[in-house]
Curated annotation (Swiss-Prot):
Chain's role: Transcription factor that plays a key role in chondrocytes differentiation and skeletal development. Specifically binds the 5'-ACAAAG-3' DNA motif present in enhancers and super-enhancers and promotes expression of genes important for chondrogenesis, including cartilage matrix protein-coding genes COL2A1, COL4A2, COL9A1, COL11A2 and ACAN, SOX5 and SOX6. Also binds to some promoter regions. Plays a central role in successive steps of chondrocyte differentiation.
Alphabetized Gene3D superfamilies for the sequence: High mobility group box domain
Residue numbers of Phosphoserine PTMs: S64, S211
UniProt-listed SUPFAM superfamilies: HMG-box
Region annotated PQA, chain positions: 63-103
Short motif 9aaTAD 2, span: 290-298
Region described as Dimerization (DIM): 63-103
A GO molecular-function descriptor: sequence-specific DNA binding
Protein name: Transcription factor SOX-9
Residues within the DNA-binding region(s): 105-173
Ranges of Basic and acidic residues composition bias in the record: 56-66, 160-174
Organism: Sus scrofa (Pig)
Region Transactivation domain (TAC), residue ranges: 394-509
Cross-link (Glycyl lysine isopeptide (Lys-Gly) (interchain with G-Cter in ubiquitin)): K398
């Protein structure tokens, strides 16, 4: 309400129209005031809130008092204040302080303050565009460059001020301002409490394994660091004080170490934490986690292929083997495509694979069959065929194992008329990475139902399909024993000759 007081007075003393004006000019104020004798410039200077502090420092001090008094009183005060030795008051600091609220005896200025105040005033007059902060930095640098003889006048003036201060305030004892001291105490208390709280909190969150404590932990640590480092000024956003935060960061790092043992997940914010300090604990944890995860994908354990025997969708790791129908008794001829053959060793054939019966059948014989377009009827259920075609196909597979394209053609010409999507090509090609592309189109997998099994020779079988495999996991190529539990035949066949080495490379990504 201080700013409104003069206007309220003016409404009493002046014409009503002026009261509506939010910022009447100074000349109007002097005209309407009981003491119009004051010059316009004086009144302007003594009403800084409407002039945006033109002269600033002296007037700010009496700003709240001025508003309560008529212009003549204010002019007299301003003239007295102009004669006052302002070197005794470090005005830049005073502007920010709460001097208006309570009388506060300031400490006597030290030599640097004497220098900075005088130099700041001179420079501010010469270069009004200079930002105050830049000015302060420059003054500090210059002060460090001064030699003793250059500093002597300022040191002497500071000593004189100190003696004068002692005279003026004999019982003066320096006490930090209560507001700031409270802030300091709070910062220390917060630092203590938060450092004690961080570990239980962080461990609790780590145990939950869902909410990484890093962000909250770091913010908790930032705030004490920033409070303690910046107790002189208003708190700033936690990200700004780089140096002040260091102690906090160190605390987090120190407490980051127990976390891996306390919780099974080490959720550390690696942007702020030195990884070198955490490497042993964190990496050991990661190792165990990864090993467990990958072991479950590895075919040598035997789980990828066998679970399919029950016809349920088994999800081993990232891919599911869904063999939805039990293969007929002929499943002895059930084959997984060669791409699954690569890991023969993990699954020793549970019964001797039938020997291909028509090895001599030329691959050219198949093209007589009309080529089934890859997206042809989703031939998951294939017409029942004698095991001979399956075996002949096996024969072709054997002969064609190294030429993927012919093999896929054979499949497409195969008597079953199964729509073999071109995805078979990547599987039969020695390089596995292409499989990733093919694997992702799951609909095509289903279209080529026997895509993964030569069991297509057995009729009306929904062929187990791997859903969405990642070549990084070896099991992608593991033979699936179709629902009859018969081992995939190709294990004994040559495909392992070219696929096995690649398989071994892929087992451990």
């Amino acid at each position: 309400m201080n700013l409104l007081d003069p206007f309220m007075k003016m409404t009493d003393e002046q014409e009503k129209g002026l009261s509506g004006a939010p910022s009447p000019t100074m000349s109007e104020g002097s005209r309407g005031s009981p003491c119009p004798s004051g010059s316009g410039s004086d009144t302007e200077n003594t009403r800084p809130q409407e002039n945006t502090f033109p002269k600033g420092e002296p007037d700010l001090k009496k700003e709240s008092e001025e508003d309560k008094f008529p212009v003549c009183i204010r002019e007299a005060v301003s003239q007295v204040l102009k004669g006052y030795d302002w070197t005794l008051v470090p005005m830049p600091v005073r502007v920010n302080g709460s001097s208006k609220n309570k009388p506060h005896v300031k400490r006597p200025m030290n030599a640097f303050m004497v220098w900075a105040q005088a130099a700041r005033r001179k420079l501010a007059d010469q270069y009004p565009h200079l930002h105050n902060a830049e000015l302060s930095k420059t003054l500090g640098k210059l002060w460090r460059l001064l030699n003793e003889s250059e500093k002597r006048p300022f040191v002497e003036e500071a000593e004189r001020l100190r003696v004068q201060h002692k005279k003026d305030h004999p019982d003066y004892k320096y006490q930090p301002r209560r507001r700031k001291s409270v802030k300091n105490g709070q910062a220390e208390a917060e630092e203590a409490t938060e450092q004690t709280h961080i570990s239980p909190n962080a461990i609790f969150k780590a145990l939950q394994a869902d909410s990484p404590h890093s962000s909250s932990g770091m913010s908790e640590v930032h705030s004490p660091g920033e409070h303690s480092g910046q107790s002189q000024g208003p708190p700033t956003p936690p990200t700004t004080p780089k140096t002040d935060v260091q102690p906090g960061k160190a605390d987090l790092k120190r407490e980051g170490r127990p976390l891996p043992e306390g919780g099974r997940q080490p959720p550390i914010d690696f942007r702020d934490v030195d990884i070198g300090e955490l490497s042993s604990d964190v990496i050991s944890n990661i190792e165990t986690f990864d090993v467990n995860e990958f072991d479950q994908y590895l075919p040598p354990n035997g789980h990828p292929g066998v679970p399919a025997t029950h016809g349920q969708v088994t999800y081993t790791g990232s891919y599911g083997i869904s063999s939805t129908a039990a293969t007929p008794a002929g499943a002895g001829h059930v084959w997984m495509s060669k791409q699954q053959a690569p890991p023969p060793p993990p699954h020793p054939p549970q019964q001797p694979p039938p020997v291909p019966q028509a090895p001599a059948q030329p691959q050219a014989a198949l093209p007589q069959q009309p080529q089934a377009p890859p997206q042809q009827p989703q031939a998951h259920t294939l017409t029942t065929l004698s095991s001979e075609p399956g075996q002949s196909q096996r024969t072709h597979i054997k002969t064609e194992q190294l030429s993927p394209s012919h093999y896929s053609e054979q499949q497409q010409h195969s008597p079953q008329q199964i729509a073999y999507s071109p995805f078979n090509l990547p599987h039969y090609s020695p390089s596995y990475p292409p499989i990733t592309r093919s694997q992702y189109d799951y609909t095509d997998h289903q279209n080529s139902g026997s895509y993964y099994s030569h069991a297509r020779s057995q009729g009306s079988v929904l062929y187990s399909t791997f859903t969405y495999m990642n070549p990084a996991h070896g099991p992608m190529y593991t033979p699936i024993a179709d629902t009859s539990g018969v081992p995939s035949i190709p294990q004994t066949h040559s495909p392992q000759h070219w696929e096995q080495p690649v398989y071994t490379q892929l087992t451990r990504p």
